[in-house]
């Protein structure tokens, strides 16, 4: 069954993951709130076209839905997605001095979560032979693009984490 190895995930790992997801969601929400309050960029849906023109990629997480949950590919997609968001958050560097600490915290928490997933994949013997490499990241040429990118990346990260949280909770059920 696709769920077979899921039951071998340590409960402590799952609980730590759920805690990390909640922390990153709080960090992301803070970034979104500050971009809204400071720069009046409050509606990611209004920036979708700009996101396409900037080439902001999205991370899939289809292997973690409860209907098609497959542990190895779910962990792989989760790690790959977090790795993608690490790169996107780095691309936002210089967004604004007042947002830098929030962005730094978000980056560190995403990196910690990605590392946690990778170590668990190694423990299970399912980690790829090499760590993924960062693809082409968008280049933000103006302060507005960087701030709009921040809204879009934070919004996409929240959606990604929502899916991750549901998948992990499903795995954590006895």
From Swiss-Prot:
Any one Gene Ontology molecular-function term assigned to this protein's record: cytokine activity
UniProt keyword list: Cytokine, Disulfide bond, Glycoprotein, Growth factor, Secreted
Modifications the protein undergoes after translation, according to the UniProt entry: O-glycosylated.
Residues with glycosylation annotation: 133
A Pfam family hit: GCSF
InterPro entries assigned to the protein according to its UniProt record, in alphabetical order: 4_helix_cytokine-like_core (IPR009079), GCSF/MGF (IPR040117), IL-6/GCSF/MGF (IPR030474), IL6/GCSF/MGF_CS (IPR030473)
Cysteine pairs bridged by disulfides in the record: 36-42, 64-74
A cellular component annotation (GO) from this entry: extracellular space
Biological processes annotated in GO: immune response; positive regulation of myeloid cell differentiation
Location(s) in or outside the cell: Secreted
Keyword Secreted: yes
Broad class of where this protein is predominantly found: secreted
Subunit structure: Monomer.
PANTHER family membership: GRANULOCYTE COLONY-STIMULATING FACTOR (PTHR10511:SF2)
Sequence similarity: Belongs to the IL-6 superfamily.
Role according to the record: Granulocyte/macrophage colony-stimulating factors are cytokines that act in hematopoiesis by controlling the production, differentiation, and function of 2 related white cell populations of the blood, the granulocytes and the monocytes-macrophages. This CSF induces granulocytes.
UniProt-recorded name of the protein: Granulocyte colony-stimulating factor
Protein encoded by which gene: CSF3
């Amino acid at each position: 069954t696709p769920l077979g190895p899921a039951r071998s995930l340590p409960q402590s790992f799952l609980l730590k993951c759920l805690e990390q997801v909640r922390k990153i969601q709080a960090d992301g929400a803070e970034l979104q709130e500050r971009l809204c309050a400071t720069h009046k960029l409050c509606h990611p849906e209004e920036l979708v076209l700009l996101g396409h023109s900037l080439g902001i990629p999205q991370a899939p997480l289809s292997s973690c839905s409860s209907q098609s949950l497959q542990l190895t590919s779910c962990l792989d997609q989760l790690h790959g997605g977090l790795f993608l968001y690490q790169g996107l958050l780095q691309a936002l560097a210089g967004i604004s001095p007042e947002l830098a600490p929030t962005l730094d915290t978000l980056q560190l928490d995403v990196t910690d979560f990605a590392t946690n997933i990778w170590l668990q994949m190694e423990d299970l013997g399912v980690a790829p032979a090499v760590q993924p490499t960062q693809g082409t990241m968008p280049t933000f040429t103006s302060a507005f693009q960087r701030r709009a990118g921040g809204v879009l990346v934070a919004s996409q990260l929240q959606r990604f984490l929502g899916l991750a949280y549901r998948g992990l909770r499903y795995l954590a059920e006895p």
